[in-house]
Every structure is written in C-alpha cells, then in structure tokens.
Amino acid sequence: MSATSEYPVQRWFGMEVLDHSQGAIDWSRMRSGAPLLAQHDRWSTKGQIGVVEEAWLDDDRRMRVRVRFSKSKEAEEIWRDVVDGIRRNVSCGYLPQEMVLEKREGDLEHFRVTRWQPFEISIVSVAADPTVGIGRSTDQTTSTITIRGSEMDEQENTTTTAQQPGKSVNGEHQEPTTRTFAEPKDGALEKERQRSADILALGERFSQRDLAMQAVTQGYSVDSFRRQLLDAQAPQPIDTNPGDNQRDLPQFNHQRPGQNVEKLGITERDMSQYSLLRAINAMATGDYKDAGFEREVSNAIADASGTEARGLFMPHEALFGGMLRQQEKKTPSKGGILVDTDMRTDMYTEILKNRTVLGALGATVLSGLQGDVDIPKQLSEGNFYWLDEDGEAPQSDIDFGTIGLSPKTISGAIAITRRLRKQASMSIENLVRNELLSGVAVTTDKGYLYGTGEDNQPLGLMYQTGIPGLTYADKFGWDEAVDMETQVGQANVSANGMGYLTSVGQRGAGKKTFVAAGTGERLWHNNEVNGYRAMASNQVNADTWVFGDWAQVLIALWGVVDLKVDQATKAASDGLILRVFQDVDVNARRKEAFSIARKSVA
C-alpha cells in the first residue's frame, strides 16, 4: 500500500511537503520492523496491530510498504475491515530532520522537508493526503487521508535544520538557510508553543500522554489541563470484590509491561500450564528439561525489561496458572480453600488488594509500574465567585504537589520440604502461591503502618508528623470516635472511603462497650463503628485506633515476582528455601485524611 506522497499538507506552521527524492528518506527505522498501528496509538499495548515487512520508494515519488497483520483480536477486526474496503486510509509517523522554506503566499509559508525519518505506519479513520492509502495505484487521487505529524509530540515535530549546500528546489540552486518558521508579530506562535510544551511536559511527567495530546489539540489552557490531570488520576474507593472487567485505575492500564505477559506473545492458555513447583525443582537441580516453558517465560521477561533475575522471573499471572479447573469452592475438605476460578491478568492486583487490610479498607493498587512515579495532589482549593452578568472571573491560582512512589523490595522466605517438592497436586501449588501472596500482603500492611523510613522501608503512617490525633485515658468510646470523625471531616475528605482500623484486642473491647448507658447499643457492631466499616488486625499496636479515608492510600507494584532457591539452609533434610522478591511502595496522598487515637501513658 502507498503510505506517503508529495501532497502538500496544512500544518500549524504552514504548508508542508515531504520530499520523495532519492536520499531524502532515512530508512533505518522503517526497514527494521517498524510497527503497524491503529490510529497512531503508540502507548497502549494493544495499539500495535502488525509490522512493516518491506518499505521502498516507487517511481511515482511515493513511499510504499508491505505489512503483516497480527493475529490478535484487535488486529483481526481491523484486517476484516481492510479486506471489506471499509478501512482505506493510511498515515505515517515521521521525524523531520531537515526543512527548507520554499516560498511565501501572503502570510502562508510553504516548506519542503528534505530529510525525514518515517518510524510507524497507521491505519486511520480520518487523515489529510488524498493520494495514498490501501490499494491505491499511481493514477488514483481520491478518498484517502494521511495525517502527518499531528499525532506526534511537538519536540519530534519541530526539529529542523538548514538545507544542505547544493540542494535545489524547482531546479534552481538555493543558498543554505536557517530560517524555518515565520514568527507572528504579536508573539502568538511563541505563546502557543509554550502552552503546548507545558501541557506535554505535564502529560509526560504523570504518564498521561494521550490526555495531554487531546488537551493541546482542543486548546485547553495549562491551568485547565492541570485540573483535568488531577481528576484523571484521583484515586476512587474500589469495591472489595471488583467485577471481571474492572481495574483499580483504568488510566494505568498502559503501564503494565512488567505484569502483563500478553505483550510477550504468551496467552492465558499458555500460562495455565505454568507450574511453580516445576520452576522450583528446576532451579534446585539446574535441570530445566521439565521446566522449559517456565524458563522461556523468565527469559522473555528478562529480555523485555533489560534486567537479570536472581533465579527466575515469575509473572503475576503465573500465580493463577493451573487454577482454571473448576472444583467445588468454599469447601475446605475438598480443596475449595485452595481453588480459584478463571484466570485474569489483573488477579494478582485484586487478590493482593483483598489480602491486605489496607486494600480491604479501600486503598488503591497501582500495578505494572516502571521507575519512580509522581502522583499529583492538589494543595489548595480553587476560588469561586458570584459575578455580574458581564463580569469576568478573576484568575484562580491552584497549588499542586506530588506524592513520590519508588520501588522498595519486599523479600520473603518459604520453606519447602523434600516431600512437598515431589508433589504434583494442584492444591500443593496453590498452597505455595497462597503463602507467597499472604507474605507480600502482610509485609505491605506493616510497612505502611509502622515502616521506619530507613533500610529501604516506607515511612509508616504511625511515625509521620502532621497527622491529627487524640489520646484517651481508659477506654476508647463514643466520644473519641466522634472526635476522630470530626477531625477528618474538617479536612473535606470524601466519606466514601472512610473506615476504622484497630487491634484485635480493641475490637473485642469495642464489642463490650456501650455507646451510652442504658441504650444497649454497642460501639462495635456488625463490623461497623458509628456507621463506618471497621476492621481489626494484629499488625496494629494494642491500644491504637486509626480513622480516615483509606482511598487516599496508594499501594504501588513494580515488575514481576523474582524467585531464588536457597538449598544450603535446609541441605541436611534435602529441603529448600524459596526466596521471593517483589518491588512495592505505599504512601498516602493526604495525611490530613487520617486521625490516630492512642491510649495515654499513665
């Protein structure tokens, strides 16, 4: 199919023509497996629908390509539309490297890109070049559109240099020029460039590139985009049992390269054959004859991430591989407590969320992250005014800050006996998996509540400064609960995520404590305190109560589970220790969303 031509395209700086003479095109990226995309979607894992197999310059001064479509569901749907003649339009993403000014027509300037590098081909719905597309021959000149550059970041789109000496336009020798774009006298172009650059920088910082591009094209101001960005990334309280198609934060789906193995070409059916015990035995013996698949998965993850495993990388999906068989559930005598249902690639996130006390209270889990992450938070409220009919609203300055999340490694050890290693039972596999999940969950809870902030631990909520609180003399009662709720309510915190957390001992005391004398109503009733959900954990100190908006808590997960076998510790019994590593961090967006009550020291 034809992908580009010398058809003039209206751009934000003027008219642009891509030169198609010999030597004008840098083929390095296009001829090394450039992607075939849907609608220039370069960030979603489902955006790539194929690959460019061949690219060449034809005699009619057009770039033509031969592409191969993927067998994924999304690609198959687009391929059927192509075959049926519904999708005909093609676009090319490219980087301009050299550009010259050819002529001016009033305020309109015409540029020729004399050196450029194409790097992707897209099947699009709407574009701008009516001479290229699927199935177009040299004498066809209607119906196709190619959008060049409008889908690209501005830093890609404005990189230009002077024409090389000796280049000619329309047969006439041209002297080198360094002028590329005419600046309007009022500086409007410079302001527009700054607006676009600021929005794109914010989108890049908070992993919201698509939202930023939309804001640029729709003319949003930087302040408007900040508010839009804050709304897009604000965590919401999540139900304890999410539906099949729910996610904790949809906008983080494109950040799952470390967790989702589909991008590596591994299907859910493949993962159902993954055996944790086979992987453990292979690491112990060094013989991967029976664990070739498990080793291939680890190698694929290592290649994709550019890191080496301590032993083997295990994707989160593998924690549920093999659990696809339907057994009687919720029946301990029949293995029901060890059985899960259909595997989903987000199960690790959801089950870890439910295993942690923080998650059960409504904390937000962000998974599949890469590198340090900054989450925006609003530091001050906007100002609103009553206006006359023709009045203008004064400028409102809104302060924004960020919450930093960085990988902190949780390491655990699971003892596996010689006899346990020889078992092939699915229940034994699930037993080891459950032990792994529970260990990560308990450590995450402990880290957020009582982390010291040292030795690669997060700084726990109990040790942070600036958190509202109170003390009680003898027994936590109704008055203390009301005071805590009032402290949190004064911070304008959403009531949807509010709840109590205390120790198991205090839960028992709450069940014996009357709200008021003679009422018969208990402080702790049906796992609620004053209408708010309440939970107890042995992680909490004996005389401590915490109340707050738990949706403000962020649990961040990076990469995959890293496994390493330790044979030395239990060598005498021919057992081993499975050492587990998972990168996690926890933090809260607003400390004032919590109140802590402690028993006063006599």
Swiss-Prot record:
<feature type="region of interest" description="Disordered">
    <location>
        <begin position="149"/>
        <end position="191"/>
    </location>
</feature>
<feature type="compositionally biased region" description="Polar residues">
    <location>
        <begin position="157"/>
        <end position="167"/>
    </location>
</feature>
<dbReference type="InterPro" id="IPR024455">
    <property type="entry name" value="Phage_capsid"/>
</dbReference>
<comment type="similarity">
    <text>Belongs to the HK97 phage major capsid protein family.</text>
</comment>
<keyword id="KW-0426">Late protein</keyword>
<dbReference type="GO" id="GO:0019028">
    <property type="term" value="C:viral capsid"/>
</dbReference>
<dbReference type="InterPro" id="IPR054612">
    <property type="entry name" value="Phage_capsid-like_C"/>
</dbReference>
<comment type="function">
    <text>Assembles to form an icosahedral capsid.</text>
</comment>
<feature type="region of interest" description="Disordered">
    <location>
        <begin position="234"/>
        <end position="261"/>
    </location>
</feature>
<dbReference type="Pfam" id="PF05065">
    <property type="entry name" value="Phage_capsid"/>
</dbReference>
<keyword id="KW-0946">Virion</keyword>
<feature type="compositionally biased region" description="Basic and acidic residues">
    <location>
        <begin position="170"/>
        <end position="191"/>
    </location>
</feature>
<protein>
    <recommendedName>
        <fullName>Major capsid protein</fullName>
    </recommendedName>
</protein>
<keyword id="KW-0167">Capsid protein</keyword>
